[in-house]
Amino acid sequence: MLEELNAKDKYSFNKLQKRLRRNVGQAIADFNMIEEGDKIMVCLSGGKDSFAMLDILMSLKASAPIHFDLVAVNLDQKQPGFPEHVLPEYLATLGVDFKIVEEDTYSIVKDKVPEGKTTCALCSRLRRGILYRTAQELGCTKIALGHHRDDILETLFLNMFYGGKLKSMPPKLVSDDGKNVVIRPLAYCKEKDLVRYAEVKAFPIIPCNLCGSQENLQRQAIKQMMQDWDRRFPGRIETMFTAIQDVIPSHLLDHKLFDFKSINRDSGIIDGGDKAFDPPELPTAPLLNIDEMDVLDVIEVR
């Protein structure tokens, strides 16, 4: 599809491509996601996000000041209708190392989960264990997952609304088996950017609902809520994402994060203090970060 773009669309896509690469590069730098000599297992589901992640990491690898290796891994869970030939054929054209892991988790899930119930939770646990094991077998030092900015915010609201916790997806963590470091290089990337990127790059997308299970209804509701906010209040999503990067524990209520008990008149003003008897002064418009790629010229797409 890239070859079919007119000059204006090609210019627009070039800005998009530069923005996504910069987003990923910034996340890698901010959280020290990739280090010299790392071997990254890029988990490839066949969806737009993981395809984009692999594509961008391959691009960054070619120009990075450090050396690291990539190996793309897909788990074939033997779902009916899964097109087994698509990923091997596509990955072979890229020249990237890859491994297709075949494990019939579909039959296990269908046997254990009652008809009509969502299979996602059990399927996810089984998949996670297999991928952790595969990373060890391949000698990988990091596991890269394709969660993006919108996934992170959705998880934040899910935990707030349904779990009573101020908690989201970490950009980097140690896996629950204690043997792997998991990274999310797309943490700063917008889903709508990834959708457009996948369309132009014409990735061979594989449907995610081959098992017949439906996405978590609570997550669907949160996603729709955020999309509605984005339409009605442009910039609010960006402001919310900025907020979780600028947390002030002294102005929240978690005494495990801040020692409120020891505060007295000699403590001084903490984090700007608070005008206790005045109404809060809040901006009337969202704090928009102007994307420098929207005002800078860019190189042409080749």
UniProtKB/Swiss-Prot annotation:
Into which EC class is this enzyme placed?
Answer: transferase
Look up the record and name the pathway of this protein.
Answer: tRNA modification
Q: Which GO terms describe its cellular component?
A: cytoplasm
Which of this chain's residues are annotated to bind [4Fe-4S] cluster? 120, 123, 211
The alphabetized UniProt keywords are:
4Fe-4S, ATP-binding, Cytoplasm, Iron, Iron-sulfur, Magnesium, Metal-binding, Nucleotide-binding, RNA-binding, Transferase, tRNA processing, tRNA-binding
CDD domains named among the record's database cross-references: TtcA-like
User: What Gene3D superfamilies has UniProt attached to this entry?
Assistant: HUPs
Q: Which GO terms describe its molecular function?
A: 4 iron, 4 sulfur cluster binding; ATP binding; magnesium ion binding; sulfurtransferase activity; tRNA binding
Pfam families cross-referenced by the UniProt entry? ATP_bind_3 (PF01171)
Q: Using the UniProt record, give the first listed, main subcellular location.
A: cytoplasm
Q: Does the keyword tRNA processing apply?
A: yes
Sorted alphabetically, the Gene Ontology BP terms of this entry are: tRNA thio-modification
**Location within or outside the cell:** Cytoplasm
Which reactions is this enzyme annotated as catalysing? cytidine(32) in tRNA + S-sulfanyl-L-cysteinyl-[cysteine desulfurase] + AH2 + ATP = 2-thiocytidine(32) in tRNA + L-cysteinyl-[cysteine desulfurase] + A + AMP + diphosphate + H(+)
Reported cofactor(s)? Mg(2+); [4Fe-4S] cluster
Q: Which family, according to the similarity comment? A: Belongs to the TtcA family.
Give a short account of what the protein does: Catalyzes the ATP-dependent 2-thiolation of cytidine in position 32 of tRNA, to form 2-thiocytidine (s(2)C32). The sulfur atoms are provided by the cysteine/cysteine desulfurase (IscS) system.
**How does it associate, per the subunit comment?**
Homodimer.
Record's protein name: tRNA-cytidine(32) 2-sulfurtransferase
